[in-house]
Amino acid sequence: MYQDANSKFNKGGFYLARGLFNEKKVAVLEKEFDRVVDQIKKSGENINARWGSRLTERIESSDSSVIHTHNVQGYSHQMLKMIQDKQLLDVTESLIGGNIILHHTKLFLKPPKKGSAFPLHQDWSYFPTKKNSMIAAV
């Protein structure tokens, strides 16, 4: 099903796996996303990952926000099932090989009209890998 994934990934630097999750599964994950956001909002922790730098001060308001947490699978069994999904793992294997290791998961929510800017940036220096084998599954 994803035989051309590796060649497209190597040529363009990305691969869009259309139809990986059906509408019913996406609806479940959307509901879980909202539930996790509600849960972390109630935690009292600072969950605003607003960039807040000179790069963004001219393009966003001072009350902008982007709600953020790590390790989403710890908040939700549905999210855990998603990252363990056989089809997702098969696509991942076709891109980087069979020795797949989960580095981390993240959740971001930008509120309408005041979502924080998040400039393009490169994280490789924080997470160096051999043969550029770290990918993001979004």
Q: Where are each of the predicted segments found?
A:
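Non-heme Fe(II)-dependent double-stranded beta-helix
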Residues: 1-12, 18-120, 126-129
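Short, conserved beta-strand element in jelly-roll/cupin
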Residues: 128-138
